[in-house]
Amino acid sequence: MTVKNETIDYSKTLYLPQTNFPMRGRLPQKELELIARWDNMGLYAQLRQQAKDRPLYILHDGPPYANGHIHIGHALNKVLKDVIIRSFQMRGFNANYVPGWDCHGLPIEWKIEEKYRAQGKNKDDVPLNEFRQECREFAKYWITVQSEEFKRLGVVGDFNSPYTTMAFHAEARIASELMKFAMSGQIYRGSKPVMWSVVERTALAEAEIEYHDYESEVIWVKFPVLQADSSDLCGAYVVIWTTTPWTIPGNRAVSYSSQISYGVYEVASTQNDFGPQVGERLLFADALAMSCAEKAKLVLKRLRIISADELKTLFLFHPLKGFAGSYNDKIAMLDGAHVTENAGTGFVHTAPSHGREDFEIWNAYKPLLEQFGIDSSIPFPVDDAGFYTKDAPGFGPNREGGAVRVIDDNGKMGDANKEVINALIKADRLFARGRLKHSYPHSWRSKKPVIFRNTPQWFISMDKDLGDGSTLRSRALEAVSMTRFVPSSGQSRLASMIADRPDWVLSRQRAWGVPICIFANEDGVILKDERVNERILRAFEAEGADAWFAEGARERFLGERAHESWVQVLDILDVWFDSGASHSFVLEDRDDLKWPADVYFEGSDQHRGWFQSSLLESCGTRACSPYKAVITHGFTLDENGKKMSKSLGNTVVPQEIIKTSGADIFRLWVMTTDYWEDQRLGKQILQTNMDLYRKLRNAIRWMLGILAHDEGEKISYCALPDLEKFILHQLFELDQLINRAYDEFDFKKIMRALLDFSITELSAFYFDIRKDSLYCDAPSSKKRKASLQVIREIFERMVIWLAPMLPFTMEEAWLEHSPKSHSVHLEQFRSVPGEWQNGFLAERWRKVRQVRKVVTGALEFERAAKRIGSSLEAAPIVFISNPVLLEALENLDMAEICITSALTITQDVPPSDAFILSDVEGVGVYPGKALGTKCARSWRYTQDVGSDPAYPDVSARDAAALRELQMLGKI
């Protein structure tokens, strides 16, 4: 039967892609629809049910603070965690993600206090537990807000039952962990210089400190020699340098280093009528003497060397000796390893009330100091409001006009520096003065400078013998050595921080937090009574930590011991202890989790924060780490590599990206970064990722469209054409790379590999070659069916591989492909048949593609010269003198592979004008024009067009396809 070919619309006889999967994602709208779908179907519950018998994989969530909307760092962190959770869930694990929130602490207190100030209320007039309840409600509100923001990012987890540090059970467990430290003797009340925020009226941990440039007043001070073995030192001065003049009233010693060369110098001349005068003898480190002379505008003459042995015998007067009738103690010289000759004078003013190293060297020399008749107690020269106390005579409350202030409530320096310097000038003890811009500690909340001040606080000892020969420090260092770190540099970073850190300051003088729920006597001895502890824990479990502050709490908890002289401690715990104890009340106490966690994953700043507090808390109570691995990410900078800041106007708000572009665009950006380093983000970078997304989406869309014609016929591997086997080999290698990279948390490697595969290997190579067969071959074509089978494998594996990274787009694509499926996220990564691995074919096709590259280059040259339009207009002659390449082309249809209508291969010598590429030796191409007639259906030029009289304008292949389609009733 013949058909009049003029009645046929050939475009309707082709197997062209057909899909409802749109080219434009409309992600902001589509993602909301998918979130609603997941909620309605109970996706999280289905994931848990499906995986209940699999081995657990636990990523323990480092809790963000329940205050304000999420920022770009939160979004980055949660997306990375989500990819880990999803990838392990889809690779045979039960990866349950339980989000958490840190709820206690000063920032929330500040918010409530701000509200009070706006209402004209005084916080001190509000009952403590009423204030705490307002803090609790504030945190609860922001947990709800942040939960929705995290879910909008595509994060899947147990948002209906998250953990919070303010839950009654959590507060009870935090208290229980504290009691373990107390009962084992690791907690003590001490007097130590701590970083103190006058603005916030509390001690700060190292993790609560950030460093900013700050301009300080600096002074060089002369300490007169009181006692020396050499007569030439009587009347001489030891000169120190300090950036904190206000600490001079707290001076108790001068430190030097036995590793530094020192000398005795004489003032030879001076430009000043005040300060050091000609003939004065001064002691300096030799390396620093001349720079000090320049500061004082004088000339020094070196008289002699002074040895460390001689220095240690010296005793000095305090530079304020006699001021306000005080400062009459003698000042010892102490040999300290912390002294350097990098700056200053080589002598260090030592005030054990105002510095960690000063405190440590003072305590190390305590027995010797007492032998010298020096009072070794450490004074409290500054109070919590930044005023001098009675321990700073002449500057404290007995001073006419009242106590001088070091720093005020706004974080501004008071008059202390000025008053101390004036006193030194009057005593003729000022050598020189100046100003210095340097890095100085500030509170991370108030952004105001802090001071070191000696305060009574509660501490966890880092170096107490724990009964087995170990200390908390040694246990933690051992645990670090056994932990996996990504990147590996994190291990040495955390280890060095632990090795150098001081004892852990537990106490805070605030209101919103878990109390240090212990009783102690006036000497700081802690009550160790299990019955008292049990009463406290039962109350916390039922009522929360507010029970500690309720009226009658002391009598309630002490019970029959209430008549004894135990004092209830009212300080609250460092919030890092709260989150550091989360492994106990989350990992240990939930049936759906396990202890220890497989991984903790946070920003690199958490080496001094949550990673460290969790490690110390666990090592102190369990002698080992609560995690097996630690992964860190860097910080997000703007497009120019600058820190994001509201004042600079360069912040990127994740909610805006989601609103305008979609969460998957943000997630794609995360997946293309080296997240363990600092990343950059801005409009141009987002645009680049949107372009990548479009290419990826178009490849998926094309596969969906062509698979609309897939009838699911299965062809054995042996029967597949070589090209399909080669593509399956690439899938095999991709599978190996992707699984390995997911294990290594190298998401950029996965995304880059899949983007390259999609754009270079599929769209620009395999799909391009097979489009003619897929569109034009007959329904019964084995080649077409083989290609459809391989594309099905590609599509399903790619979508599953990408699902953890781009959960919205891959869900949309999967549901288009398998409408009856519940969700791609319920799928598992599929095993790859070993027979797909074929190194021989891979090498063969590497050679084939070298030849193809030369042919393609020649055709591009012809197209640019407008000698051809489509590559189908060409019938190139390929000259191959390389026998290895020639052998690789045997039995291959190179015209199809190069997408030309014909192609001739010859071993003849190529003409001089043949097209060549320098990196492919032995191949030349002469781009001849295709002979024959253009097929109206496939657009190929062949000499058999019209060979079937029923279809005079199509090739024999296309005519046969049309006959088969007609026979099947498809046209």
Swiss-Prot record:
It holds the Pfam family tRNA-synt_1. The keyword RNA-binding does not apply. NCBIfam families: ileS. PANTHER family: ISOLEUCINE--TRNA LIGASE, MITOCHONDRIAL, SOLEUCYL-TRNA SYNTHETASE. Monomer. Coiled coil: none annotated. IleRS has two distinct active sites: one for aminoacylation and one for editing. The misactivated valine is translocated from the active site to the editing site, which sterically excludes the correctly activated isoleucine. The single editing site contains two valyl binding pockets, one specific for each substrate (Val-AMP or Val-tRNA(Ile)). It comes from the Bacteria. InterPro entries: aa-tRNA-synth_I_CS, aa-tRNA-synth_Ia, Anticodon_Ile_BEm, Ile-tRNA-ligase, Ile-tRNA-ligase_type1, Ile-tRNA_ligase, M/V/L/I-tRNA-synth_anticd-bd, Rossmann-like_a/b/a_fold. The keyword Transmembrane helix does not apply. Its EC number is 6.1.1.5. A motif ('KMSKS' region) lies at residues 643-647. Its main location: cytoplasm. L-isoleucyl-5'-AMP binds at residue 602. This is Isoleucine--tRNA ligase.
